[in-house]
Each structure stands twice: as structure tokens, then as C-alpha cells.
């Protein structure tokens, strides 16, 4: 679990080298800067659930069986079981979180939300958008910078099992980076789009990543464990279509080139 915090740790170390403790302090302060407007927070929090809701509605219209709300009665137990599935963690943290979630519905909700914010939002976004994108953006178009981050982000997700397979000539593992490249392409562009409209605040993109994780896990593992309501390829396709729409709508900011030394305001 703690390996997920590699991007955050790398960003803090590099910023400390570049700007010392003052630079680190300014960087950490960007996590909670409330400089973004309401639209950024609305997109960050509600776009992912809205896409999932539309997909579920379309499936229902096409006659695909959709679980009823009554099937959510056991959501607390589903969260506990989901966490226990990671009990191999050597730190014992997931066991503690599962125990906490089992104590009541409020505890389960807080654990679930907190985990989605921490693992992905806080662990990754400071590194990928807060550091990598912020340094690739000056002198480039936003969409180009987001594509450079996309490649690094996708291959970072492959993990040690992928590289072990490569060294053992187990070529089936090549599907791992291909999968992550497909999944993270639309997300990298969408996250960058929100970030450049957030006036230097990382909070909206942290919440966006958290909202995506919470939605994805909910419809694939929590609502009906073992029987995803929405197949991951369908979700990825929906986000890709959404990204194409965003590129059309936000092409002025995504294709504008940010001058070197320019401030945090969106171009």
C-alpha cells in the first residue's frame, strides 16, 4: 500500500532539492489552496459518478439486468470484505481499516472515502500533476504535457510483477502496460484539464482522482461483489468519449501553449 506513495515522495524530494524547505512548504500548501472555482470542484466530484449513472441507465434501457438499490443493503459488509482481500499487506494497515469499517456504517463510509482520497488522490496527484505536469507544461501545449505524464503514469502502474515477467520472458505481461495505457489516457487529459483551471491548487485534481477511484471500485467491487455492474472496458470507453468531448469544448486551454515563467492562471 505504501508503495503507492512513490510519486508523492519523489515530488517532495525533488522539490526539497530545488527549493529547500520553503519550496516543500509551498508545495504542500497547494494541496489545500481554495483558489479554484466552483466548476473545477463540480467536475472533480461529480463527473465520474455521472458517467457511471449514465452507463447504468443505458444498460437498463438496453435490457441489461441492473441490480436494485435493495442489493446495497450489505454495502458495509462488502467494504469490509473488499479490505480483507488486501490482508496480505505486511503493515497490517488494511486489517486495521477492515476492523474499523466493521464497527458501523459511519466508520465504513469514512474508511472508504478516506482510502479513496489517500490512495490515488494524495499518493499520486502531487507527483504526476503537481510536479511532473507543472514542469512539463511551460513551453508546451497542455495536452502534450498531459500525454508525456500519461506515458510515465501508465508504466509506473505496471509494478514489479510486470518487470519480473519481462526478465523471465513471460510475454503475457505485455498486456499489463497496454491496459494501463488505455485506462490512464483519458484520465491524464481530464486531470490536466481540471488542474490548469484550478489556479495552482492541487485540491480539485486530488478530489477528481478520489472520486474516480470511489466510483470505479463501487461499481466493480462493492455494489455486487464478484459481479461488476459495469465492466472496466465499458467504463474506459465512456471516459475516452468524455475526454474527446472535453477536448472539443476545452481546446482553447488544452491546445494553448503556456509561456515559460507564466503564472498559475489557465491559458
Task: Show where each model-derived region lies.
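Functionally important transmembrane alpha-helices
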Residues: 147, 169-234
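Small-polar-interrupted transmembrane alpha-helices in polytopic inner-membrane proteins
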Residues: 52, 142-161
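Active-site His/Glu-centered metal-binding helix of metallohydrolases
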Residues: 122, 126-127, 131, 155, ...
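Membrane-interface helix/loop boundary segments of multi-pass membrane proteins
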Residues: 123-150, 196-201
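Membrane-interface interhelical connector segments
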Residues: 76-98, 127-134, 161-172
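Residue-level signature of the transmembrane alpha-helical core
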Residues: 5, 45-46, 113-118, 147-154, ...
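Hydrophobic/aromatic residues in alpha-helical transmembrane segments
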Residues: 54, 132, 187-191
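Specific transmembrane helices
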Residues: 1-121, 149, 196, 217-267
Amino acid at each position: 500500500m505504501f508503495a503507492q506513495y512513490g510519486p508523492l515522495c519523489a515530488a517532495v524530494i525533488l522539490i526539497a532539492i530545488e527549493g529547500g524547505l520553503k519550496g516543500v512548504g509551498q508545495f504542500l500548501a497547494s494541496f489545500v489552496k481554495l483558489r479554484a472555482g466552483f466548476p473545477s470542484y463540480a467536475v472533480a466530484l461529480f463527473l465520474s459518478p455521472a458517467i457511471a449513472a449514465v452507463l447504468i441507465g443505458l444498460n437498463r434501457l438496453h435490457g441489461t439486468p441492473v441490480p436494485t438499490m435493495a442489493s446495497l443493503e450489505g454495502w458495509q459488509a462488502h467494504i469490509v470484505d473488499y479490505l480483507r482481500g488486501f490482508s496480505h499487506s505486511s503493515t497490517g494497515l488494511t486489517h486495521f481499516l477492515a476492523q474499523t469499517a466493521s464497527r458501523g456504517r459511519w466508520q465504513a463510509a469514512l474508511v472508504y472515502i478516506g482510502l479513496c482520497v489517500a490512495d490515488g488522490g494524495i499518493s499520486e496527484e502531487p507527483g504526476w500533476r503537481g510536479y511532473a505536469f507543472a514542469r512539463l507544461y511551460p513551453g508546451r501545449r497542455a495536452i502534450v504535457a498531459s500525454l508525456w505524464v500519461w506515458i510515465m503514469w501508465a508504466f509506473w502502474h505496471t509494478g514489479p510483477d510486470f518487470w519480473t515477467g519481462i526478465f523471465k520472458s513471460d510475454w503475457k505481461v505485455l498486456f499489463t502496460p497496454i491496459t494501463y495505457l488505455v485506462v490512464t489516457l483519458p484520465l491524464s487529459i481530464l486531470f490536466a484539464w481540471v488542474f490548469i483551471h484550478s489556479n495552482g491548487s492541487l485540491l480539485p485534481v486530488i478530489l477528481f482522482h478520489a472520486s474516480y477511484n470511489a466510483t470505479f471500485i463501487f461499481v466493480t467491487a462493492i455494489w455486487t461483489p464478484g459481479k461488476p455492474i459495469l465492466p472496466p472496458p465499458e467504463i474506459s470507453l465512456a471516459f475516452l468519449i468524455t475526454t474527446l468531448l472535453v477536448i472539443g469544448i476545452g481546446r482553447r486551454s488544452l491546445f494553448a501553449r503556456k509561456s515559460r515563467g507564466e503564472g498559475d492562471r489557465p491559458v
